[in-house]
Each structure stands twice: as structure tokens, then as C-alpha cells.
Amino acid sequence: MNVEMRGLHLLLLSVLAAAPVAGQEARDTLDVFFVGNSYIYFNNLPGLVEGISEKLDGPHLKTASHTHGGHRLSEHLSDGHLPSALQSDGSMSQTWDFVVLQEQSALATVTDTVTGELGSPVEFQRAVHDLASQVRNLGATPALYMTWAKRRWPAQLTDISAAYRGVGAELDAPVAPVGEAWAAVSTRRPDLELFVADGSHPNPAGSYLAACVMYATLTGRSPVGAPREVWGQPWNGAGPMESDTPALLVSLTAADAAFLQEVAWEVVNHAEAR
């Protein structure tokens, strides 16, 4: 085989290798960037979302994040790091389909004189509006990650839900109703723990629920059938860690995983029907 024919042969092989297998369609990909704090990096939520999407028939979600423990959205605005983070992630094309915004804990609500929880709905609304404007200037769609009530104060959810839904409506931005799904699980399966010991942060089951809600919200598809075990980038108290070796992020029983998937889909569907 001469050099010219050999080159043509190799080109043909590369084209065939890249083509979808008969009976299979190429999958769409959504690039999703998460902005927030430890409620995102605990159990590597972006990695869970990505891992769940890999095993389902819908779009594949490729994720990245910019997080700091305890950070408010207003601090992400003021520290000046977010614009460069959004435009300089080397693993993707620097274009995002969605940028998910997560406010600090219950900051979206008014300060609670009973619980002592500090809230600043005006700060929350201003920060979300400013960040959403930046996100849209980059050609992406802002999405809101509704947080949950802490274990000791479940009544917080009413104000949290109203705050996220209100600003979501103002911005015409999708709201991932994680807090509402959390409350539904706590009511229907109080034996299924979603918190770590501090009663605030998510354990692996809590993050798995959040990932199912996020997947359903961003894709419009059901997370039912997602794997009960998800592997991904390991994480520690500062966020995801650089590693060539994937870690087991969550391992649930088949029954618990199916229940969380079903609740996530029910809550997202109910929210969209409002």
C-alpha cells in the first residue's frame, strides 16, 4: 500500500471509529457550571450529576464548579474570581448551557428571631440578578439551586421556596426544587437520613437526591433508572480534588435509590405544573 493510499485508509478508519454504532444515536451534551459553597462540593454534587447522566438515555451533562465554603453569592460577585472561572475552565470549550447559582444556606429568607438564622432576601435577590446578567452575557442560562431547611427548623422551607421561586419567576430562570424534594423525602421516609451530623450539610443520599432533581430540572427528563452507585472525582473539605483515580461518591440500596429518583421526578413535575 503506497503512502497516499495508506493515509486515505487511516482517515477512513478514524471516521468509522467516530461514527455512532448502528442503532445508536449520538447523545446531546449540556455543559453545566455550578457556583456556590459546600452544599455543592460536599460529596461532589457536580460529579454526581455527571455520573447519573452518563447512565441515562438523555443528554450527557458535563460539569465544572466554582465554590468556597460558606460563601454567599454576593461574595462570589465581590471577590472578582467568578468571571475568569467561567471563561477559563480548560476541560471544556468555555461556553456553558447552564450556570447554576446556589445561595448560602437560608440567606434567601429573613433573619429568624427564633432560630437565629441570618437572612438577607434583598442581598440574595440583588446578587442573583447581577450574576444572572453576567451569565446571560456569556450566552448561558442561569438556573437556581433551591436549598433546604435545616434539620432543626423544617419550617424554614416555606420562605426558602418562596424566595427562590420568586426570583426565578422574575428572571425567567429554571429553579431546581431540591429543598422541596428534601422535605418530601423527610415526610415520606423519615428513616432515610439526608443530613450529616451537623443537620445542615448533605450526606451522600442527600447529594444524590439533589443530583436527581438537578438532572430532571436541566434536562426535562426523568432520573428514574439512574445507577445506585456513582463514581467520580474525590472531594475533601475544600472541594473536589485533582486525581486520576475515581472515588465512590455514593452507594445506596436499590430501593433507596429508586425512591429518591421517583421523588425527584415527582417534585420537579409538580413544580413545572404550577
Walk through the language-model features, giving the residues of each:
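Short, surface-exposed connector motifs at secondary-structure boundaries
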Residues: 28-33, 140-142
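Boundary at the C-terminal end of the N-terminal hydrophobic targeting segment
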Residues: 21-23
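Conserved SGNH/GDSL esterase-like catalytic core that processes O-acyl groups on lipids
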Residues: 30-33, 39-123, 270
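N-terminal secretory signal peptides that target proteins for export/translocation
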Residues: 1-5
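Conserved catalytic region of serine esterases and O-acyltransferases that act on ester linkages
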Residues: 28, 201, 211-274
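Alpha-helical cap/lid subdomain in secreted, periplasmic
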Residues: 88-207, 216-225
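Bacterial N-terminal signal peptides
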Residues: 7-18
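Short alpha-helical patches at coil-to-helix transitions and adjacent helical residues
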Residues: 42, 204-211
